[in-house]
From Swiss-Prot:
UniProt-recorded name of the protein: Adenylate kinase
Compartment annotation: Cytoplasm
Chain positions covered by the region annotation LID: 122-159
Organism whose genome encodes this protein: Shewanella woodyi (strain ATCC 51908 / MS32)
Database matches in Gene3D superfamilies: P-loop containing nucleotide triphosphate hydrolases
Length: 214
């Protein structure tokens, strides 16, 4: 099952991504992780990306698409994969379709901006693993501690309100158009599209996702 997650920063994508990966046994594909792995492995695309990054430039969509294509061909993606945070723009989505990277199901988690601002200030992260908690909505078993390791949780600087609002502006400008884009792709029967109310509890959203994906 090839799944793509859409939603604003703070909509709860990280928590649902973790759930989907465990439930369906598929890897999450993050472009940042992919870039680092390709550079470390010294693949031709990795060396090309390193050259660009060392020069302080942005890695082109073409190069990223090449890396995604390489990544989804690996053995652990045989049962599918989860794309979160990519594509971010319509040109990237077009390039991905042109490269023959098909998506079976687009999952959108929808949350109003003001709710996101409120949520972010209560977010806590385990720096080692990236596991995300919330002091109200998704509490750790022990306050301030990671469930798995027992290590301290931290507040990320980009959970500050001004930063959150800036990120939401960028999301609405660049990524929100993908909602309409993939809605049209689904209308043409090339993928399935499901939208979920992300203001519900984490468990409710997870349950609805399972029903939609089954």
């Amino acid at each position: 099952m090839r799944i793509m997650l859409l939603g604003a920063p703070g909509a709860g994508k990280g928590t649902q991504a973790q759930f989907i990966m465990e439930k369906y046994g598929i890897p999450q594909i993050s472009t940042g992780d992919m870039l680092r792995a390709a550079v470390k492995a010294g693949t031709p695309l990795g060396l090309e990306a390193k050259k660009v990054m060392d020069a302080g430039q942005l890695v082109s969509d073409e190069l990223i698409i090449g890396l995604v294509k390489e990544r989804v061909a690996q053995a652990d993606c045989e049962k599918g994969f989860l794309l979160d945070g990519f594509p971010r723009t319509i040109p990237q989505a077009d390039a991905m379709a042109d490269a023959g990277i098909a998506i079976d199901h687009v999952v959108e988690i929808d949350v109003p901006d003001e709710e996101i601002v409120k949520r972010m200030s209560g977010r806590r992260v385990h720096p080692g693993s990236g596991r995300v908690y919330h002091i109200v909505f998704n509490q750790p078993k022990v306050e301030g501690k990671d469930d798995v390791t027992g290590e301290d949780l931290a507040i990320r600087p980009d959970d500050e309100e001004s930063t959150v609002r800036k990120r939401l502006d960028i999301y609405h400008e660049q990524t929100k158009p993908l909602v309409e884009y993939y809605g049209n792709v689904a209308a043409n029967g090339q993928t399935k599209y499901s939208k979920f109310d992300g203001t519900q509890s984490v468990a409710s959203v997870s349950e609805e996702i399972v029903v939609a994906l089954s």
